[in-house]
Curated annotation (Swiss-Prot):
Residues engaged in binding Zn(2+): 194, 228, 230
Homology family: Belongs to the staphylococcal/streptococcal toxin family.
The species this protein was found in: Streptococcus pyogenes serotype M18 (strain MGAS8232)
Function: Superantigen that acts as a causative agent of the symptoms associated with scarlet fever. Has been associated with streptococcal toxic shock-like disease and may play a role in the early events of rheumatic fever. Superantigens cross-link major histocompatibility complex (MHC) class II and T-cell receptor (TCR) molecules, resulting in an overstimulation of T-cells associated with a massive release of pyrogenic and inflammatory cytokines.
Miscellaneous section: This toxin seems to be coded by a bacteriophage.
Keywords linked to the UniProt accession: Signal, Toxin, Virulence, Zinc
Protein name in the entry: Exotoxin type C
Amino acid sequence: MKKINIIKIVFIITVILISTISPIIKSDSKKDISNVKSDLLYAYTITPYDYKDCRVNFSTTHTLNIDTQKYRGKDYYISSEMSYEASQKFKRDDHVDVFGLFYILNSHTGEYIYGGITPAQNNKVNHKLLGNLFISGESQQNLNNKIILEKDIVTFQEIDFKIRKYLMDNYKIYDATSPYVSGRIEIGTKDGKHEQIDLFDSPNEGTRSDIFAKYKDNRIINMKNFSHFDIYLEK
């Protein structure tokens, strides 16, 4: 009987300790919004690599090595890391366009990006996007023609960057004094589907590599299927 009572007491103490500690663990695991903004402001204050009609030197199961000599000089290249499924769509000597954000920079030989690759497109186009902005659930001015894309096939990385850049320039979403604490982009297609992009996601240590790794899938969209974008910001 004594043994049973001791076991009960130990069990009760354990439950109390767990319930006391759990909230602390939860709050510590969530990165403070000021740190998230700081990470994202640093990561996206960047000039993207925007190169046209470059040749693929070689490909592996997860990497494309792309010749950018005509832009950067002899023996200069871009190394694009991507998922296996994405990399299999390209092969050696393919001509591609690059729009990517570097996470490692080696000024002597090349840059390292995630995804950011589309087939080379020689036609000149101007797609002026239709967009809407909502702040704390209230509709603001429309953002029609604020974002322009100059290719028929683009990566979500390019759309994401250009919309973020507009928001950073005009709404200061990542500034320390910014009132915004969460937000997302929703990209609508003509078949009624929606793709979401979290505007306040800074995983792991919040390095450029951590933040840009989501572009490994090299997701693309044909602008013939693009409908509009919606931005939702919360204070």
